[in-house]
Amino acid sequence: RSGITQLLTTERIRVIDTASLSVKDIRENALYQPVRYVKPDTTLGIATKPFKAVIIGFGDTGQELFKFLYEFSAMVYAKDISTPFECFIIDPKAKVLEQELLSKCPGIRHDKDSLHFMCGRTEDFSREWEALIKEVDYIAVCTNSSEGNLSLGMQLLDMAYRLRDADKTLSIFTGIYDTVKFANASYIADYYRQHTTQGAQTELFRFELVPFGKREDIFSYANVLQEETIERAKSFHYEYQKTKLYKYGGKTEQDPEKEWTKRAEEFMQEGMSGKAKITQQEI
């Protein structure tokens, strides 16, 4: 019983990494993996074009996106591709952030030539954007302003329609944090999608606007509590079984995980009534 008491009285402090959770859906969606954009040769198992990305706003969320893109762009590329991964990071504090990144992640110094930090305030920057929009595969707009992110994302999408080849895939991710604003952004993204598709299958343009980072989803039960709650339930069930001498004689499996699995198997053997006692996550 002391084990049960300890489980119930242990104080818990949970630190929520909102930046990491903001990009979770992007990271876990196969459609948004860098491999989609590099024209993979499935016969040879290599990428036939480099992967180029732009990150606008290099705060916590921008840095999480960079980590994801840097890690998942590590593929086998064709021999004639000298710079397989390029990332353009645009932030008013570009120079300071560049030094901070290199000090935190010294391992990327050998890839320094692939990283381009830009403040975005020069007079020639509009011309630089016109060149970038023709070539990059992936744009993430993640400043602190939902309205600003959506507005800039739409401007970049319109620029792509004017300047970019229609068959070159481009995804523009916009950080939208408020629930109502996220719904509006999703409506706008669907509008663009519907009006750049001919019939049910034919895409006139391979460009898309993708909102991400809704706070309501970030602080959901599934993200914040589900895993911890199930683990505590396993431990509680294990300790509780030890007290049920009349049924098990104090004998349990070797660890909470095995005892939990045995519980699920027993319920499944009971048929539908037993299945109703098991949560969907367990099944």
Where do the language-model regions lie?
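Cytosolic regulatory regions of ion transport systems
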Residues: R1-I283
